[in-house]
Amino acid sequence: MNILDQLDAKSLRDDVPDFRPGDTLNVHVNIVEGNRSRVQVFKGFVMGRQGSGVRETFTVRKVSFGVGVERTFPVHSPIIDKIELVSRGDVRRAKLYYMRDRHGKAARIREKRESSASSK
């Protein structure tokens, strides 16, 4: 293991939940305005994940006042306070770029139903 791999391993976060494209997330982001810092929540669905390791990013999309807003976050960034998984989505694609062209009911993502082994 070389020096760069060791530095990358130190920078990885261990509190990242297991999320996939289609899942709905609350991303708590630290915003610095002048000398004050506050936490802003960005809620939307995951459009995709790119990269691996320290350089891994994910894109979250939401519709705010009729305007689609997409934001790309580094997974292991220190500006992210925490990531909450709200619900799981049932999709068949790794990248949900087709959702940009959908409006209204067509823009909905089915919720994934968890199968329980104890119900048999």
From Swiss-Prot:
Function noted in UniProt: This protein is located at the 30S-50S ribosomal subunit interface and may play a role in the structure and function of the aminoacyl-tRNA binding site.
Gene3D superfamilies (alphabetical): 2.30.30.790
Single GO BP term: translation
Protein known as: Large ribosomal subunit protein bL19
Any one GO molecular function term: structural constituent of ribosome
Keywords recorded for this protein, A-Z: Ribonucleoprotein, Ribosomal protein
PANTHER family membership: LARGE RIBOSOMAL SUBUNIT PROTEIN BL19M (PTHR15680:SF9), RIBOSOMAL PROTEIN L19 (PTHR15680)
InterPro entries in alphabetical order: Ribosomal_bL19, Ribosomal_bL19_CS, Ribosomal_bL19_sf, Translation_prot_SH3-like_sf
GO cellular component assignments: cytosolic large ribosomal subunit
Gene source species: Kocuria rhizophila (strain ATCC 9341 / DSM 348 / NBRC 103217 / DC2201)
Protein family membership: Belongs to the bacterial ribosomal protein bL19 family.
Pfam families cross-referenced by the UniProt entry: Ribosomal_L19
